[in-house]
Amino acid sequence: LFSHGSTIKTPDGSGIYYSDLIADYNEEIQTTKLSFIAQIDEYRFKSGTIGIRDIKIAEGPGKLIGIMGASGAGKTTLLNILAGLETPGKGKIKINGFDIHTEKRKVEGVIGYISQDDLLIEELTVYQNLYYNAKLCFANLNETEIELRVMKVLEDLGLDHRKDLKVGSVLDKRISGGQRKRLNIALELIRQPAILFVDEPTSGLSSRDSENVIDLLKELSLKGKLIFVVIHQPSSDIYKMFDKMLIM
């Protein structure tokens, strides 16, 4: 079986990705109304130093966009500004015409943010980590609805066959690095945000796991999500999965 976020390597070394099949055979018509516009004229650090300036971004649904640059170029800072975690001194970020800072309630639940940090509870299983997160997010849903939602996300991310394994610590390796990253993505994905901001999802992963994680994000974009990813030194195969690359 060709599972979600997986890769088949051909004899010549090139890859066939799950997202390729989604792109070829996905007949769903994307009707998502989504407009993301960022105008960042200037952002200063607390020291007063200018960190970001003259950035203009206008994107819609169904895109996987990378953010690349040298160490210290401000990639994560830009991601945080776009996600609304930092406020530009001059400029605005708007989703469907609503300012994400002054009209927060109008865009509530639209944004998802996945940091580099591992947020899993090592004593819990794969299923339990996502289940308890869902309980916190959906106090209005009954038990059956939560269980169905959790299993749907695990299946979509190819983690259903690992659901009863304890995740352990990052060094314990009870589940692979790629599976840990997918489960961290699931913690945000279960809320069904339309826009995802992901900070260095391939950090510390093998080349195969890195490809599988980006392939998963590509698959999500093909289903209508707008995804911004800070990426560091991607391979040529990973680079080609992005619809656009912002170089800093």
Q: Where are the language model's segments positioned?
A:
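Helix-to-loop junction immediately C-terminal to a conserved catalytic motif
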Residues: 83
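Catalytic Walker B motif of ABC-type/P-loop ATPase nucleotide-binding domains
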Residues: 196-200
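ABC ATPase NBD Q-loop/coupling interface
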Residues: 92-106
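Q-loop/switch helix immediately C-terminal to the Walker
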Residues: 122-139, 149
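The feature captures the beta-strand-to-loop junction immediately N-terminal to the Walker
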Residues: 68-70
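Conserved ABC ATPase "signature" region
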Residues: 145-166
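Conserved catalytic motifs of ABC-family nucleotide-binding domains
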Residues: 192
